[in-house]
Regions:
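Polar/charged alpha-helical tracts
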Residues: 13, 26, 30-33, 121, ...
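Alpha-helical solenoid scaffolds in large eukaryotic transport, assembly, and signaling factors
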Residues: 19-83, 102-111, 115-120
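Amphipathic alpha-helical binding modules
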Residues: 95-138
């Protein structure tokens, strides 16, 4: 670990999968480990927030995912990989994970008539069901 790395990072700079992390914090770390394109966002988040705040981080993840879906940011993490990862995590039915995915990802997806709303049709079956519960009108 170098002085400029977050305290929860491994020698290669990736977030450490700590057995003591709460499910919501572990979700963030697992996302960054699975999709390294989120590393810069993660590092900035940890620096600005002085730690990991999963709901705050996932608001940014939602924005990046929609930008990628719309093709507006070639450097944004691939939206398909993000949705696939979140679908897998949602299928685990872990309360701390579900709370973050539903509250800070699904609820912040664009509303009908807004650019990017079509991403809702790309959700896997688990997230689509959760989305329908929290936003029945789309």
């Amino acid at each position: 670990m170098t002085p400029d790395m977050p305290p929860d990072a491994t020698a290669d700079g990736a977030p450490d999968a700590s057995p003591h992390a709460t499910p919501d914090v572990q979700l963030v770390k697992d996302l960054v480990a699975e999709i390294p394109a989120f590393e810069d966002l993660y590092e900035t988040h940890v620096f600005n927030q002085d730690g990991v705040l999963p709901h705050v981080f996932f608001w940014d993840v939602t924005q990046e995912t929609v930008q990628s879906y719309l093709g507006l940011d070639a450097d944004a993490p691939d939206w398909r990989r993000t949705l696939r990862f979140l679908e897998e995590q949602s299928a685990r039915d872990v309360p701390g994970i579900d709370e973050v995915v539903v509250t800070s990802f699904l609820e912040y997806l664009p509303f009908p008539g807004k650019p990017g709303h079509e991403i809702v049709s790309e959700l896997g079956p688990v997230m689509a069901a959760k989305f329908a519960k929290v936003r029945p009108a789309g």
